[in-house]
Amino acid sequence: MDTPDYKRVVLKLSGEALAGNDGFGINPSVVNLISAQIKEVVELGVEVAIVVGGGNIWRGKLGSEMGMDRAAADQMGMLATIMNSLSLQDSLENIGVATRVQTSIDMRQIAEPYIRRKAIRHLEKGRVVIFAGGTGNPYFSTDTAAALRAAEIEADVILMAKNNVDGVYNADPKLDENAKKYEELSYLDVIKEGLEVMDTTASSLSMDNDIPLIVFSFTEQGNNIKRVILGEKIGTTVRGKK
């Protein structure tokens, strides 16, 4: 049996990832593909927590640019992440993966409230835990939510599965054919060079808590989530303090 390099991981999925080529909304076939890959990882004995974005439905920053109150726009974005999380939970449970959604905003008729000790207990029992609603506060991204939850549950690594991007580049590879892909760099490099990996708040939080980040594409052939967990060098690794 393959031996994973990590025992407990936080998987960060963008909202756009759930939309697939549709660009908007939730594409059930894409969600099912992601769920099947996650199931393979769970079967390795890895404890999997997930943070999903909401950009396939709504972006708070866009609402703010349209003249909305930023806090209200961000709250709409939090609700979008909860919709995505419920979709992913349903897909996972349909293939036999026990899953719990925990929300940063109290809505007990729909999901559990986020309780750190309870989340860890779920993970220890082999359940997937999806952290929904971001941090529960406006002005904070779901990347920051992933960094925060990873620190709280003492995750070994944050896995950032990107849609059609296979790592971190010094320029947009879709626009610049000479863009250079990084194999490895530090959070300080990310912050100093303004690389579009995580926002500064998320990068600083991950750096301070020495949580490595691996950025990769899950749209390539095969299960890249599993490949990363088994130690295969794909994508870009962002180091913590070490």
Curated annotation (Swiss-Prot):
<feature type="binding site">
    <location>
        <position position="163"/>
    </location>
    <ligand>
        <name>ATP</name>
    </ligand>
</feature>
<feature type="binding site">
    <location>
        <position position="59"/>
    </location>
    <ligand>
        <name>ATP</name>
    </ligand>
</feature>
<dbReference type="GO" id="GO:0005524">
    <property type="term" value="F:ATP binding"/>
</dbReference>
<feature type="region of interest" description="Involved in allosteric activation by GTP">
    <location>
        <begin position="20"/>
        <end position="25"/>
    </location>
</feature>
<dbReference type="Pfam" id="PF00696">
    <property type="entry name" value="AA_kinase"/>
</dbReference>
<dbReference type="GO" id="GO:0033862">
    <property type="term" value="F:UMP kinase activity"/>
</dbReference>
<feature type="binding site">
    <location>
        <position position="172"/>
    </location>
    <ligand>
        <name>ATP</name>
    </ligand>
</feature>
<feature type="binding site">
    <location>
        <begin position="12"/>
        <end position="15"/>
    </location>
    <ligand>
        <name>ATP</name>
    </ligand>
</feature>
<dbReference type="InterPro" id="IPR011817">
    <property type="entry name" value="Uridylate_kinase"/>
</dbReference>
<keyword id="KW-0067">ATP-binding</keyword>
<feature type="binding site">
    <location>
        <begin position="135"/>
        <end position="142"/>
    </location>
    <ligand>
        <name>UMP</name>
    </ligand>
</feature>
<feature type="binding site">
    <location>
        <position position="74"/>
    </location>
    <ligand>
        <name>UMP</name>
    </ligand>
</feature>
<feature type="binding site">
    <location>
        <position position="169"/>
    </location>
    <ligand>
        <name>ATP</name>
    </ligand>
</feature>
<keyword id="KW-0418">Kinase</keyword>
<comment type="similarity">
    <text>Belongs to the UMP kinase family.</text>
</comment>
<feature type="binding site">
    <location>
        <position position="55"/>
    </location>
    <ligand>
        <name>ATP</name>
    </ligand>
</feature>
<feature type="binding site">
    <location>
        <position position="54"/>
    </location>
    <ligand>
        <name>UMP</name>
    </ligand>
</feature>
<keyword id="KW-0665">Pyrimidine biosynthesis</keyword>
<comment type="function">
    <text>Catalyzes the reversible phosphorylation of UMP to UDP.</text>
</comment>
<dbReference type="InterPro" id="IPR015963">
    <property type="entry name" value="Uridylate_kinase_bac"/>
</dbReference>
<dbReference type="InterPro" id="IPR001048">
    <property type="entry name" value="Asp/Glu/Uridylate_kinase"/>
</dbReference>
<comment type="subunit">
    <text>Homohexamer.</text>
</comment>
<dbReference type="GO" id="GO:0044210">
    <property type="term" value="P:'de novo' CTP biosynthetic process"/>
</dbReference>
<protein>
    <recommendedName>
        <fullName>Uridylate kinase</fullName>
        <ecNumber>2.7.4.22</ecNumber>
    </recommendedName>
</protein>
<keyword id="KW-0021">Allosteric enzyme</keyword>
<dbReference type="InterPro" id="IPR036393">
    <property type="entry name" value="AceGlu_kinase-like_sf"/>
</dbReference>
<comment type="pathway">
    <text>Pyrimidine metabolism; CTP biosynthesis via de novo pathway; UDP from UMP (UMPK route): step 1/1.</text>
</comment>
<dbReference type="GO" id="GO:0005737">
    <property type="term" value="C:cytoplasm"/>
</dbReference>
<keyword id="KW-0808">Transferase</keyword>
<keyword id="KW-0547">Nucleotide-binding</keyword>
<dbReference type="GO" id="GO:0006225">
    <property type="term" value="P:UDP biosynthetic process"/>
</dbReference>
<keyword id="KW-0963">Cytoplasm</keyword>
